[in-house]
Regions:
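Short helix-loop-helix connector
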Residues: 85-86, 164-168, 180
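Alpha-helical transition-metal enzyme core signature, strongest for iron centers
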Residues: 67-75, 97-112, 146-157, 179-190, ...
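Soluble, non-transmembrane catalytic domains of enzymes that act on hydrophobic metabolites at membranes
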Residues: 168, 191-196, 200-207
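Short, charged, amphipathic alpha-helical segments
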Residues: 92-96, 174-177, 207-208
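Amphipathic alpha-helical segments within well-ordered protein domains
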Residues: 78-82, 95, 161-164, 176-177, ...
Length: 302
C-alpha cells in the first residue's frame, strides 16, 4: 500500500468501547431534547423580543442564513447516514443527530423570519450553497461524515461561540447555547465512527477522500471571504473566525486519530496550505500584496 493511502495504526480502543460511546450519543440526545418553539418564545419573552441595532440586521442575517441552510443540509445528511450505515450504534447516533438538526433548522428559520422575514434559498450566499451542495452530493459515507462532522460542524460551532460572545442579540445568544450543546455531540459522532469507515476503504478510495477534503477546505475559504464585511459590521475580526474554525477542525481530526489509534495523513501539509491560502485571499487586512505573498510563503514553509 502506498504511503499516500495508508492509515497508520497505533493503539486502538476496544470496539466495544466505541459502540458504547456511539450509543451513548443517542441516549444523551434523547435525555436532552428541548422544544425549539417553546424555548424561542421563552427567550423572546425574557428579552422583550429581538433586540438588535438596525444597522446590524443585514450582517447577522447574512451569517445565519448560512447556518440555516447548513442545518438543513446536516438534517438531510444525518438522515441519509442513518439508512446507509450498517453499524447499529453509529446508526443510532446518526438518528439522534437528524432529530437535533430538524429542531435547529425550524428554530433558526423562525428566528430569521422574525429578524427580517427572509429565509428563502435564493437569498443564500452562493459560496455557501456550492459548499453545502458539495457535501450533500458526496458519493461515499466517509465524505459525508468528514464533510459534515469535521468541516461544517466545527465552523458552525465557531460562529455560534463568537457571535454569542459579542451578544449581538440576547435572544440569539440564548438560542446558541442550546445549539452548541447539541452540535458538540455531532462532532463526537464523526470522530468516533469515521476511523472504522476508513479502515475498510481501499487505497484509491482514501486518496480520493483526501483530495475531496482539500477541495472542501478551499470552498470554505470562499464563504469566509464573502462574509468578511458582515463580520466587521458586527465587530468581529475575520481572522479570528478563520483561526478559531481552523483550530476546531484540526482538534476534531486529532481527537479522531488519537481515540481510534490512527495517524491521519497529510493534515499538517493541508493546514499549512490552508493558512497560506487565507493570507492571499483575505481582504479584511490592508496589506500590500507582496507582503501577503511573503506571509503565505512563511505559512507553507513553517
Amino acid at each position: 500500500m502506498s504511503s499516500a493511502g495508508r492509515v497508520k495504526e497505533r493503539t486502538r480502543l476496544d470496539p466495544r468501547i466505541i459502540d458504547d460511546k456511539l450509543a451513548g450519543l443517542y441516549h444523551k440526545g434523547q435525555d436532552r431534547i428541548w422544544n425549539g418553539k417553546e424555548y424561542l418564545q421563552e427567550c423572546l419573552d425574557k428579552h422583550g423580543g429581538i433586540n438588535i441595532k438596525t444597522n446590524n440586521v443585514e450582517a447577522l442575517h447574512n451569517i445565519f442564513m448560512i447556518i440555516l441552510w447548513g442545518e438543513l443540509a446536516a438534517w438531510k445528511i444525518s438522515a441519509s447516514l442513518a439508512t446507509e450505515i450498517e453499524d447499529d450504534s453509529a446508526r443510532m447516533a446518526a438518528t439522534a443527530q437528524a432529530h437535533d438538526e430538524a429542531r435547529h433548522f425550524y428554530v433558526m428559520k423562525d428566528y430569521l423570519e422574525l429578524l427580517n422575514g427572509n429565509t428563502t434559498k435564493e437569498d443564500l450566499n452562493k459560496h455557501a450553497d456550492r459548499f453545502l451542495s458539495y457535501i450533500l452530493d458526496a458519493n461515499h459515507i466517509s465524505k459525508k461524515l468528514l464533510g459534515m462532522q469535521m468541516m461544517v460542524e466545527p465552523l458552525a460551532l465557531t460562529l455560534f461561540r463568537i457571535v454569542r460572545e459579542k451578544d449581538v442579540d440576547p435572544v440569539l445568544s440564548d438560542l446558541l447555547i442550546m445549539f452548541e450543546r447539541d452540535e458538540a455531540r455531532h462532532v463526537a459522532f464523526g470522530t468516533l465512527h469515521l476511523p472504522s469507515v476508513l479502515r475498510k476503504m481501499t487505497t484509491p478510495q482514501r486518496v480520493d477522500l483526501w483530495i475531496w477534503q482539500f477541495r472542501g477546505y478551499m470552498k470554505q475559504f470562499q464563504i469566509l471571504y464573502s462574509l468578511e464585511e458582515s463580520f466587521e459590521q458586527l465587530g468581529i475580526r475575520p481572522r479570528r473566525v478563520y483561526e478559531a474554525a481552523r483550530k476546531k477542525q484540526l482538534n476534531a481530526i486529532n481527537i479522531m486519530a488519537d481515540e481510534m489509534g490512527i495517524q491521519y495523513p497529510f493534515i499538517d501539509a493541508m493546514m499549512r496550505i490552508s493558512d497560506a491560502r487565507y493570507e492571499l485571499g483575505t481582504a479584511s487586512e490592508d496589506r500590500p500584496y507582496l507582503q501577503r505573498i511573503r506571509r503565505a510563503t512563511e505559512k507553507v514553509l513553517a
